[in-house]
Amino acid sequence: MWIADKWEDYELLDCGGGEKLERWGRQILVRPDPQAIWETPHANRGWKNAQGRYHRSSTGGGHWDKEKLPEQWQMRYRDLTFQCKPMNFKHTGLFPEQAVNWDFAREKIEQADRPIRVLNLFAYTGAASVACAKSGASVCHVDAAKGMVAWAKENAKVSGLADAPIRWIVDDCAGTLSPFCLRRRALG
């Protein structure tokens, strides 16, 4: 198993009772986690001092208590920078556990003896796109949500990659792949 253990700006502080206590840069968040099934006494003061807490609704969705939380903040991972902010369904725009995959992709790109092109589908806020571009790949970033692609562009910018060879596409991934698959079929 690979573990995302190179973070300085992210830390799982405690978990249990269906929740996790995390440090995101300087922000302490409490978010639901259905896999944290054991009980916890919540003795860690961080539980009470969290700047943001997401409350899941029994009817779906939920809401943030975030009076002490900035509207957005930056997180750094190695030589990458990402914008984070509380959004619907407990998310912040970044999945820290995916850092091992960014590292794996970067290692392969840097070891290649040829130019590398990456197609990142369902690319969300672009962490993988930014990581691959930072290592020299040309990237095609595809997500159906215009707001997510705009956020990904901002992540590229704050990572010093505003002019990197990243093609930003707002489209349904199946729509993007259909012409490619048709061309491939025609070529045999």
PLM regions: where:
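N-terminal accessory targeting/assembly segments
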Residues: 1-4
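Non-catalytic substrate-recognition/targeting regions of SAM-dependent transferases
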Residues: 6-22, 29-96, 103
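Conserved alpha-helix/loop element of class I SAM-dependent methyltransferases that forms part
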Residues: 96-113
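Conserved class I S-adenosyl-L-methionine
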Residues: 113-124
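A generic structural signal for alpha->beta connector loops
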Residues: 115, 136, 163-165
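Conserved SAM-binding loop of SAM-dependent methyltransferases across substrates and taxa
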Residues: 125-137
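Conserved SAM-binding motif I beta-strand of class I
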Residues: 138-143
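S-adenosyl-L-methionine
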Residues: 145-188
